[in-house]
Amino acid sequence: MAPVSGSRSPEREASGAKRRSPSRSPKSIKSSRSPRCRRSRSRSCSRFGDRNGLSHSLSGFSQSSRNQSYRSRSRSRSRERPSAQRSAPFASASSSAYYGGYSRPYGGDKPWPSLLDKEREESLRQKRLSERERIGELGAPEVWGLSPKNPEPDSDEHTPVEDEEPKKSTTSASSSEDDKKKKRKSSHSKDRAKKKRKKKSSKRKHKKYSEDSDSDSESDTDSSDEDSKRRAKKAKKKDKKKKRRGKKYKKKKSKKNRKESSDSSSKESQEEFLENPWKDRSKAEEPSDLIGPEAPKTLASQDDKPLNYGHALLPGEGAAMAEYVKAGKRIPRRGEIGLTSEEIASFECSGYVMSGSRHRRMEAVRLRKENQIYSADEKRALASFNQEERRKRENKILASFREMVYRKTKGKDDK
């Protein structure tokens, strides 16, 4: 351990000597060497050897012969040389990055890249590549999820006729499953009913035994009365059971009838679908004798409300309408000016109508005005009749009033 410590201390001294060299003169250096450094001659030689070792280690293997000649001078040199060679790269790093025409690519304190780091990077890269290949083959369900096993059929590829066979198979399978479930439920319900009956019968037996023990203690007359009561109770219970069974049988029958009707209707619908698969079945078919558009349902339900369509006849309108009625023609509505009544009737028969609200309003006005029409003679007769009736009423009222006034005045005169 002594030579190693000695090899480190001269390095520090050498660096200190380099720093001091420009300030001191050569005489002072000699004087400092002569008295003091007799003991440390080996140290100075080791300094020289350290410097040579640094330069030789960086310049190459060609200078190894010189190192051998320096080693032969003293044992201290040969002991201190390997330690100097060990510390050579670190000393060169602390000093400049250029020695003997050889420059380090990294410079400064950065170490050389090791082979282990490269091998680690290569192994990590290979692992990453293999992992990505595996993900590409198998997929990552936690990120993307799985695709559907049975995708929905395309409307262009699969027509409804092609899809009928799988539909029938699925319906048959579902119906068989439903039948199995119903059978299981019915069996469970029967077992429960049997258990309940057994419990009831056991309770009845216990009651009977208790009643028998009580009846033994009582008289014979009481026992006969109890027997009759029991018989009556038994008969009532039997009647109730029969009624329940009858109800259950009726329910089962109704369920069977419903199933049969539903099955028959489904079969009929399937047959119709096979005959005409492209028919629209969203609307229910209702036989209608009417030709043209149907009347709106809102008007049919508005019988309770008073209709308030249009207003009174305009001046001259009644006479014009009366002429149409006399001729037996259809009265034209407003908005139909320019067309004859025959043309309008032919258009309506073929299915042409006005826009919805206008058509309803004008049709109602036309019907109301047709009912209002009177000829001029009828109007005169009505007016004269009304006037005569009014005069008669007035005369009656006046006559009764005169009589009353006369009676009162006559009674006063007599007094």
From Swiss-Prot:
Biological process (GO), any one: hemopoiesis
Chain spans, region Disordered: 1-311
Listed Low complexity bias regions: 23-32, 54-71, 84-108
One MF term in the entry's GO annotations: chromatin DNA binding
Chain intervals for the UniProt region annotation (Necessary for interaction with HDAC3 and transcriptional repression): 273-415
Bias (Acidic residues): 212-225
Residue numbers spanned by region Necessary for interaction with CIR1: 177-272
Protein name (Swiss-Prot/TrEMBL): NF-kappa-B-activating protein
One Pfam family matching this protein: Nkap_C
Role, per record: Acts as a transcriptional repressor. Plays a role as a transcriptional corepressor of the Notch-mediated signaling required for T-cell development. Also involved in the TNF and IL-1 induced NF-kappa-B activation. Associates with chromatin at the Notch-regulated SKP2 promoter.
Localization terms from the record: Nucleus
Basic and acidic residues biased stretches: 116-136, 156-168, 259-270, 277-286
Subunit structure and binding partners: Component of the Notch corepressor complex. Interacts with CIR1 and HDAC3.
Family under the similarity heading: Belongs to the NKAP family.
InterPro entries: NKAP, NKAP_C
UniProt keyword annotations, A-Z: Acetylation, Isopeptide bond, Notch signaling pathway, Nucleus, Phosphoprotein, Repressor, Transcription, Transcription regulation, Ubl conjugation
Phosphothreonine modified-residue sites: 159
Organism from which the protein derives: Mus musculus (Mouse)
Ranges annotated as biased composition (Basic residues): 33-44, 181-208, 230-258
